[in-house]
Amino acid sequence: PPIREAIREYLFAEITRYWDESTTSARASEVPSYFHTLLVPTAMKLWHLASKHSFDTRTGSWWEYIAYLIGGDYHQTAIRQHPVIGPLSNAAEAHIQQILEDMNVRPTIRQPNRATDISEVLTVQGNQGPDRSTRSDLYLKRHDGTEMYFEIKTPGPNKGQCREMKERILTVSALRKGHSTLALAGCAYNPYNPTGDADGYAWGMPSY
């Protein structure tokens, strides 16, 4: 299919460019994760020439662009780094921050629940308030008019990144109240455990 070929050509060009750049700046102390080794099999042999951190950073833009290609192929509109602007009531902003704080304390006061969290924020979100702006990594508009806003992170996001994703989901939902909107977060699949058993992961995904 054309979309598959477009993704293949994009990844080939980006990985080739990254590898050429990385061979000029050695960093010997880092070892690739299982995920990186699967993506670039030769990484284990030559990883001393590259930086794991720079690889994580670079792949973040790859996932976003691939999602953009796929979204544009299936939906009416696809835009990267799309600004979201609208009024945010003081009550909604305060409730978003309260949700985040309640999830941050130990023992956890509140367990994340997408439907409940969004519903509570929309209940206190009015039509007035200072204009606020945020940015969506990827905006898609379906043929039925539904708006989809994605916050995209690299595999295994840390606690701060998970909190940021949750805040963006709730903020976008509030800013687009009254529209047919889905605010979502996405991470590339991380096959850290070769058995594919999620219960066998060496680390737990932070919950937000």
Model-identified regions with their sequence ranges:
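Domain-level recognition of nuclease-like catalytic cores that cleave nucleotide substrates
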Residues: 182-208
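Surface-exposed cleft-lining segments at the edges of enzyme active sites
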Residues: 52-56, 121-127, 151-160
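Conserved catalytic cores of phosphodiester-cleaving nucleases, focusing on short active-site segments
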Residues: 71, 136-140, 144-156
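Active-site metal-binding core of divalent-cation-utilizing nuclease and nuclease-like domains
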Residues: 82-143
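Arginine/glycine-rich "motif VI" loop of SF2 helicases in the C-terminal RecA-like domain
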Residues: 174-180
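Nuclease-adjacent, charged terminal/linker segments that flank catalytic cores
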Residues: 1-87
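Active-site-adjacent loop/helix micro-motif of nuclease/hydrolase catalytic cores
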Residues: 156-167, 194-196
